[in-house]
């Protein structure tokens, strides 16, 4: 009798979850995507000053939920690791929980990783006021994904980031043609690199900022920190500036070289000295232009559909004519210390640029 009751309860619960996800969830009518267009160009680095930027890691886990979730150590371990590398911001983003360690500090960032579904379709809410508990546990449809982003974006004081989109079956690259109401994409993650996903979003007119995170689950393991980072525009090192930079494209993705023979102290020193060498990035007279304070290495300019538009082994200046088919252009390069920097695109615009909008189901 007890087994039968338990079986019926489990069956009823599963049936509820299936109906809620595949029947009750709104079905969205997505507009046909279109590339960026317009005669003017939006440039998130128009007033670039190196001293206004600081390193951030916004995706790190600690031991929580009585050990059910994957995480070791505490928030103090996260703070110690990233403080030692000179980071201006280091959020703890436990699953479905806002960690309040250090909440009195001006640079404290309330954040959590949203999602407890099987495919690992996760989102990062930076500046979260509360946890949104709604999720869909089974393989997600495009409408499921959009509904969750819409719910999270109701908190207008936060920034919503799609985490590790290339991991498992959390997202399909084709989803990024349509999804709105998120601000940034975790392109750089220790588990997956997702340039194809980012270029899909950009090629279909969705301006979303690049983010790089370690996604460490044990900050005490120094090999799991200082791998990927985000440079954010925050002259005053305040949380409001951080969130605004994520929402307005003032971020730079950072890939840090990993060498087995490099002690953590050397990596920390390298990050504290990190310098993009960029002095200016601008558009003028139909040309993408950039100047560097010293030589940079392996310069690439990537455009529509992820096409490489230009390459140079070394460069002190960039002067690239912009063609009619260039809807966006983004640059990436390395410095002699091995750090690689990925910039958000300069893109065509015929109105406001961003990815927050009303999506009607």
Task: Walk through the language-model features, giving the residues of each.
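Structural recognition of alpha->loop->beta junctions
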Residues: 175-193, 229-241
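A metal-dependent hydrolase metal-coordination microenvironment
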Residues: 22, 28-165, 178-180, 188-199, ...
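C-terminal functional module detector
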Residues: 1-49, 65, 218-361
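Substrate-binding cleft/loops of secretory-pathway carbohydrate-active enzymes
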Residues: 105, 170-182, 219-229
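Short acidic loop-to-helix transition motifs that present clustered carboxylates
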Residues: 167-171, 192-193, 315-316
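Glycoside hydrolase catalytic-domain groove-lining segments
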Residues: 201-208, 212
């Amino acid at each position: 009798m007890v087994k039968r009751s338990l079986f019926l309860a489990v069956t009823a619960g599963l049936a509820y979850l299936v109906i809620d996800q595949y029947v009750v969830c709104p079905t969205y009518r997505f507009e046909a995507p279109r590339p960026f267009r317009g005669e003017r160009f939006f440039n998130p680095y128009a007033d670039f000053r190196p001293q206004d930027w600081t390193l951030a890691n916004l995706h790190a886990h600690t031991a929580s939920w009585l050990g059910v979730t994957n995480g070791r150590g505490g928030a103090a371990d996260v703070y110690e690791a990233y403080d030692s590398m000179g980071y201006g911001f280091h959020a703890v983003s436990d699953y479905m929980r806002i960690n309040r360690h250090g909440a009195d500090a001006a640079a404290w960032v309330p954040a959590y990783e949203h999602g407890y579904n099987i495919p690992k379709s996760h989102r990062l809410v930076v500046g979260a006021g509360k946890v949104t508990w709604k999720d869909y546990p089974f393989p997600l449809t495009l409408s499921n994904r959009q509904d969750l982003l819409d719910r999270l974006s109701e908190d207008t004081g936060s920034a919503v980031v799609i985490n590790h989109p290339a991991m498992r079956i959390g997202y399909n690259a084709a989803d990024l043609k349509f999804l709105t109401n998120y601000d940034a994409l975790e392109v750089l993650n220790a588990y997956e690199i997702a340039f194809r996903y980012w270029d899909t979003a950009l090629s279909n007119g969705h301006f979303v900022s690049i983010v790089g995170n370690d996604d460490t689950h044990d900050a005490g393991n120094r090999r799991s920190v200082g791998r990927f980072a985000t440079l954010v525009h925050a002259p005053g090192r305040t949380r409001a500036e951080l969130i605004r930079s994520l929402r307005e494209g003032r971020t730079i993705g950072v890939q840090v070289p990993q060498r087995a023979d490099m002690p953590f102290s050397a990596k920390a020193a390298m990050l504290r000295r990190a310098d993009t060498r960029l002095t200016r990035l601008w558009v003028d007279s139909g040309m993408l232009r950039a100047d560097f304070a010293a030589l940079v290495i392996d310069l690439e300019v990537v455009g529509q559909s992820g096409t490489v538009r230009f390459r140079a082994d070394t460069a002190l200046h960039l002067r690239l004519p912009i063609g009619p088919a260039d809807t966006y252009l983004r640059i990436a390069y390395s410095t002699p210390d091995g750090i690689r920097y990925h910039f958000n695109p300069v893109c065509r615009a015929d109105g406001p640029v961003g990815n927050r909008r009303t999506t009607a189901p």
